[in-house]
């Protein structure tokens, strides 16, 4: 494994970025580990972070009128989780919990938008 792969391995989802941009991305990110059955976010929570699932499995779900769990989507890392909520500046429309132990990178979306989405380059 080369030094760039070691340094940015968790960010391979963004491998198309230049090294200086990957450094910027790391500066606005926090890596967290979660255990099976922990909650990442609840329906109605504000979408402050872009969530990059590095490893593990999550489920997005809601409840029907009889309070039965309705699974909307399962994701296996690496994957972005409910990123459309960030783009649309909406609160989450579902809950997200972990089906396995997992690692997630939380990217400050406001800073991400300023650094990467609103620049013409």
Where are these regions (language model features)?
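Short phosphate-coordinating micro-motif centered on Lys-Gly-acidic
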Residues: 39-45
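Cyclic nucleotide-binding regulatory module and flanking cytosolic helices
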Residues: 1-36, 80-81, 85-90
């Amino acid at each position: 494994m080369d030094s760039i792969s070691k340094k940015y391995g968790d960010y391979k989802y963004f491998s198309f970025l230049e090294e200086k941009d990957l450094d910027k991305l790391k500066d606005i990110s926090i890596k967290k580990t979660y255990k099976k059955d922990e909650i990442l976010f609840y329906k109605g929570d504000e979408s402050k972070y872009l969530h990059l699932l590095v490893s593990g499995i999550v489920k997005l779900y809601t409840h029907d009128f009889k309070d039965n769990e309705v699974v909307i989507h399962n994701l296996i890392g690496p994957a972005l989780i409910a990123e459309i909520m960030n783009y649309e500046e909406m609160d989450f429309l579902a809950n997200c919990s972990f089906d396995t132990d997992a690692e997630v990178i939380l990217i400050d979306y406001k800073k991400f938008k300023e650094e990467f989405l609103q620049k013409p380059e």
